[in-house]
């Protein structure tokens, strides 16, 4: 019986390290990709090889995103992400991230959004050792605005 508890304890410790690694990897990816967008006025393609489904903060119907991503280019992009929480569903395979995205932006060929303030939920899958987005839901927070984009075209 003592041996059983040692094994059980060992599994619990190893599992917690796996989960902690996933959490930190995804948080870092969200922060790094946001910093890239702020510096380059364009987004990083982090979509799954299967593409993704998204609800955008501008409202409207669900958007189907190709694996190549969506062409997000901005005249300016000044967004901060904060309060990132990650829930690991299956260690090293699937997780959900939730966070806030706040600032201002002007997507190319769309109106400026001066008080962008949204809640973000994203489902991630691990593909060949890299976390990729499979689904996203962006919803505006009361007092803020969502994006002015309404189409992938």
Task: Enumerate the predicted regions with their spans.
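Short beta-strand edge/turn micro-motifs at domain boundaries
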Residues: 117-145
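Sec/Tat-exported extracytoplasmic proteins
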Residues: 30, 34-41, 48-51, 56, ...
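Surface-exposed, charged secondary-structure patches
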Residues: 67-110
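Short, low-complexity N-terminal intrinsically disordered segments enriched in polar/charged residues
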Residues: 11-46, 147-153
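A short gly/proline-enriched turn/hairpin at secondary-structure junctions
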Residues: 37, 47-63, 72-76, 108
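Sec-dependent signal peptide recognition
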Residues: 2-10
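Solvent-exposed loop/turn segments at secondary-structure junctions
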Residues: 52, 60-61, 102-105, 139-142
């Amino acid at each position: 019986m003592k041996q059983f508890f040692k094994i059980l304890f060992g599994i619990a410790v190893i599992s917690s390290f796996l989960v902690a690694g996933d959490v930190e990897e995804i948080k870092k990816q969200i922060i790094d990709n946001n910093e890239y967008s702020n510096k380059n006025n364009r987004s990083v393609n982090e979509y799954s090889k299967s593409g993704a489904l998204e609800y955008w903060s501008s409202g409207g119907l669900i958007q189907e995103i190709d694996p190549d991503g969506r062409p997000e280019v901005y005249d300016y992009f000044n967004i901060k992400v904060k309060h990132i929480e990650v829930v690991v569903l299956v260690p090293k395979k699937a997780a959900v991230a939730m966070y806030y995205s706040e600032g201002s932006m002007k997507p190319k060929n769309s109106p400026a959004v001066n008080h962008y303030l949204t809640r973000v939920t994203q489902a991630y899958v691990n593909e060949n050792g890299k976390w990729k987005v499979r689904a996203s839901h962006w919803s505006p927070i009361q007092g803020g605005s969502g994006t002015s984009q309404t189409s992938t075209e």
